[in-house]
Amino acid sequence: MAVYASNGITSVAASLARLMGFSPPHGADEPNLVLERYARAALGDRPVQRALLYHPDGIAHYLFARHTDVFLPVLQAAPLALPVQSVYPPVTPVCFASMYTGLPPEGHGICSYAKPILRVDTLFDAALRAGVRPAIVSTSGSTLSKIFLDRPMDYYILDSVDEVNARAEQLLREDEHDLLLVYNGNYDAAMHRYAPESPEALRALRVIPPPRACGRPRRAGRPQPLPRGSRPRRAGGSASAALLLPGAGRRRRGPRPRTAR
């Protein structure tokens, strides 16, 4: 079998946990040593205090090779770019489950295009044990809106990519979470409907929502706590820009996580 990258996506969970200073999920694959060494050279022994994981779905490596100009703004902003190898089958639920458990499909149990709630240990469980506050911001019906439910953390489930990006920027400004996952499915939807390199899909690949100020919301609009294991309701939002920025700073300890209404 050809090897396209020295690390697989199962390295993501342990890599992020190690960088943020907590123990990886039980049984997770080894971290990406290149990423870890780079971070240690940049940060020394200091852990990463804030992390944003941005997931634009369906963007395969061949798109990067054929349409590199689209990715130039990311390459100019990102200090390190690493290829990682997928699992099989390379469909969204299987991949996200492998990324955030650190396990192969047979280990976490999602082996096809299905979206059950994972019952094995995940990055989010490991983060919560360490007092790290995670949140997921995603469109309704997506893999990220389903397979990691039933944890005492925040879920912001919205109707559109613009709303997702607006809420993500708002959450970054509020700075009440340590680990934020953001999902955009606009390219994936266009690719499946038309074709991977159709004009419609390539337009979606290039779309960046216009920036807009997102002030701190009024307290009356803030989400209220729900009991452990409760399902999220949809949260409101408006169009804004997505941000891709790993943060640093002193970790604040706040109240128990909330689930958005």
Functional labels for PLM-detected ranges:
Residues 1-261:
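Feature captures the catalytic ectodomains and active-site-proximal regions of enzymes
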